[in-house]
Amino acid sequence: MDGAAGPGDGPAREALQSLSQRLRVQEQEMELVKAALAEALRLLRLQVPPSSLQGSGTPAPPGDSLAAPPGLPPTCTPSLVSRGTQTETEVELKSSPGPPGLSNGPPAPQGASEEPSGTQSEGGGSSSSGAGSPGPPGILRPLQPPQRADTPRRNSSSSSSPSERPRQKLSRKAISSANLLVRSGSTESRGGKDPLSSPGGPGSRRSNYNLEGISVKMFLRGRPITMYIPSGIRSLEELPSGPPPETLSLDWVYGYRGRDSRSNLFVLRSGEVVYFIACVVVLYRPGGGPGGPGGGGQRHYRGHTDCVRCLAVHPDGVRVASGQTAGVDKDGKPLQPVVHIWDSETLLKLQEIGLGAFERGVGALAFSAADQGAFLCVVDDSNEHMLSVWDCSRGMKLAEIKSTNDSVLAVGFNPRDSSCIVTSGKSHVHFWNWSGGVGVPGNGTLTRKQGVFGKYKKPKFIPCFVFLPDGDILTGDSEGNILTWGRSPSDSKTPGRGGAKETYGIVAQAHAHEGSIFALCLRRDGTVLSGGGRDRRLVQWGPGLVALQEAEIPEHFGAVRAIAEGLGSELLVGTTKNALLRGDLAQGFSPVIQGHTDELWGLCTHPSQNRFLTCGHDRQLCLWDGESHALAWSIDLKETGLCADFHPSGAVVAVGLNTGRWLVLDTETREIVSDVIDGNEQLSVVRYSPDGLYLAIGSHDNVIYIYSVSSDGAKSSRFGRCMGHSSFITHLDWSKDGNFIMSNSGDYEILYWDVAGGCKQLKNRYESRDREWATYTCVLGFHVYGVWPDGSDGTDINSLCRSHNERVVAVADDFCKVHLFQYPCARAKAPSRMYGGHGSHVTSVRFTHDDSHLVSLGGKDASIFQWRVLGAGGAGPAPATPSRTPSLSPASSLDV
């Protein structure tokens, strides 16, 4: 039939699948309602003596342990079958007085006969209803052999004739309705209170219980998602309700934003290197070791609420100004850009400048030097690129003017005269003079003189400039030239029009690089360093622009973006491929910080070492050492990597690509030992079974491909396919015994699969409620449904990971935040500990093998954060106070 399918069958098949899925959900809901009524009638008709219906005060018969409410049968021996599922298995629940709550019934009376409660699940595996769960509420005893209805699967044909199908369907519904347990009195025993509306678990408009209290339902984009409650949970009120005792502390940030930013690398008086990535300003001391002044490693200023775009260091070498972009909040409302002035020794914010005064973001800023840094000039990213001057000590704006409609890439005060400001950018160099306004907000004036190129070719961009000790200015441009601008006498023709008191003209030109010059740096000995783009050269220039020495940056690090002078002859170089290099012109340079250059999605942690692997849109596959905070190795995948997972042995790693291709690499030799293509759509998840015998690959073609794997993980062969999802696969997890899979899809399905039994879909999802999972990364499921915020559209949570000790759940959301919840998290609006720092959607989170650290990936900011887990189940002592949520307050902007 497949070979004869016409071109129009694809949309028709998709529509049929969608209708089948909707019908299945509606049938389950109707069966629950009908079954409740049918069970009540059956008990009245078959089991209840007439005397028990005389009134509420009539005692129950001797054989009954509980009296029934008026007009209802007693709840002594209700029977239980598949609750709105396809497998009709009837079981009886012996009851006796017990605690109220959500349960499978009270405990059995003493002396009652008990039988094992396990029910056989599809594929031969067993699913225990009570064993292994704390305080099981009752014993489930089969009353009759399990009966399996021959309901045809989606996209499959039935063996029965068309005329018999309606009759069989009605028969199945009647059996299910007659056998479904009604937990009569369960709501009354709780005082009629819905646990989701109780003080311990505030109600939610998107979740509710079904009539029997055996499942929870939530809605995403109006779609109902039913999740069955494990048998060991008698009431949601007994589940954890507060935030976890564990907290996170930012341990290390991998990466440096050099690809698309400037003014991003400086050296402080303490010797620490300061730079930024995402919303974090990093203070790095080469050499490693514990953080803090006088030590090593990293410290972090985390007071910003969106991506940092530029930095400036005060002349005292201690205070730092950092400007951020505007961004939007989780509701899509624009946030206001701002400049923070903060102390690099204490990480305390000293001043917040320009809140509400800038548009879109802060593009460039600089401190004055002639007056000990009393003033700060700022250029924003509005269409007019407003130039403003501020009093640093009081946060007061002294002057403001529209600079130009063209891009402004750099700004700076003349170090000998704070009344002179220079800006450069697209096809311009402007010389500004500002006067007055000191002590009077907004009363100062700014006047402009354009730099005239005259006989010299006007470049497209002038990305950088530097002031020389003699007062001249050097500019680097997109043509690879260094121009020397000298002062000329005052312009007597324009004083009435506010002309500048002096003008600058080009006095010399030197061709320094092939391609654009991105950085100029004045050294302490008076020489100048220039960094080229296309040629990746770093050149030292003496008086008269005579080349003294040069070095070339290796190609895989990219072009020179920024230069800073360290201690002695040491230089720090930032590159366009987000690397930070350290060295000198004679000995060369080596990387101290490295990172990805494009959006990240793939993340997995090593099963026995503190290492993790990342991949993304830059086509690089990187293995990181979490102890040394260094890149162990990287290879070029040639294609976009979207997901990865280590084999349990750690010897190989599987990587899924965006073309339907997946690779298996040896982690020691980096050789590709397997290269397979499944379909032509991107792969969103790869996951080894806990015993390493299988590899599951979730694709955007709605299929989970299963492969048998050799003991060393190097060889694999197709075992089967799990087909039944109506949308692309997003997440999947293996059961602890390695026989079953739980999976989520793009249309919010939760499906279960019997892999060992032939990759069959388990239609009876209720039977999987007590199954234990080796990992928990599915974002939809009873144990984690409390992580979803109100009003979610289904895309708000990108990644989820349960810790190996099963104490906490980490969540990556679309609002740049990492959350920590208690596990299980099965209460609506569950509280969490929230951590900021990423400047883009957080795409993935994973715990290391010993739960000592958590790794999170930023999306478009290409950042990798390594968090230390502190507290009850973490690597260190719990802090005395709860974890702080980053904000603009000084106390919460620290993470030392």
Curated annotation (Swiss-Prot):
Residues 50-209, 876-896 are annotated as: Disordered. Residues 134-145 have a biased composition (Pro residues). It is found in: Cytoplasm, Cytoskeleton; Cytoplasm; Nucleus; Midbody. Pfam families: Beta-prop_EML, Beta-prop_EML_2, HELP. Phosphorylation at Thr-881 during mitosis is required for interaction with TUBG1, HAUS1, HAUS2, HAUS3, HAUS4, HAUS5, HAUS6, HAUS7 and HAUS8 and their recruitment to spindle microtubules. WD repeats lie at residues 234-286, 295-344, 350-392, 398-434, 448-487, 504-543, 549-584, 589-626, 629-667, 674-709, 716-755, 765-823, 830-869. Signal peptide: none annotated. One of its GO terms (biological process) is microtubule cytoskeleton organization. Residues 77-88, 174-189 have a biased composition (Polar residues). One of its GO terms (molecular function) is microtubule binding. Changing residue 889 to A: No loss of phosphorylation. The keyword Thylakoid does not apply. The modification Phosphoserine is found at residues 176, 198, 204, 883. It comes from the Eukaryota. Belongs to the WD repeat EMAP family. This is Echinoderm microtubule-associated protein-like 3. The lineage of its organism: Eukaryota, Metazoa, Chordata, Craniata, Vertebrata. The gene is EML3.
